[in-house]
């Protein structure tokens, strides 16, 4: 890091400060900004406060008549399908996040701050794409085609990246396409469990989906490293990740969802 030694601090200490301070600031803001109950949230419209209060009351009434255990979630095919889909998505998320700097370093020969700036380019476009996709999904009330479509576009980006070699501009375009689409999956994906499970079943389902899915954070990068070592290049690993996104699209497209109202 270029900040290594600045103000007597090592590079890793600056890294911890850069990652930790925003979280501390967000925690203080949250303490004063968030409320204990929906009816106290002045930043919500009266209609939104009323809807949320009624939904919470309905969930409490459902919980009074019984609860869904984690064991019941283990027996749910829907939960396992969603867990598998989330596993595939998380595999790509962490693989690209952890390996992209190395891929661009090998292709460009850049290091330090210049490499960091180069690596951020795809994620700048990703921020805008996530907002656009999420808003469009909310406006239309459509969920699974947004997830499946983003997965397929992300797969195309990875396939293009696998064939880009050391062409830095083409790599940037490929990963921008991949991340803009693939990262947009997650906000819409988490609207699916409540549609399929509902009530208290959603809580146990969320826990299992999140637990199983996050294993992809280990499996994906490890697979990339193993294939890089055995093949000598990044292409095979990216093609495997692309195939995973195609499978994700097929899994989500096969789900039968209730119709949701556009916002």
What residues fall within each predicted segment?
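Extracytoplasmic gate region of multi-pass secondary transporters
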Residues: 71-134, 186, 190, 220-221
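Helix-to-loop junctions at the C-terminal end of transmembrane segments
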Residues: 129-142, 228
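C-terminal transmembrane helical hairpin of 12-TM major facilitator-type secondary transporters
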Residues: 143-192
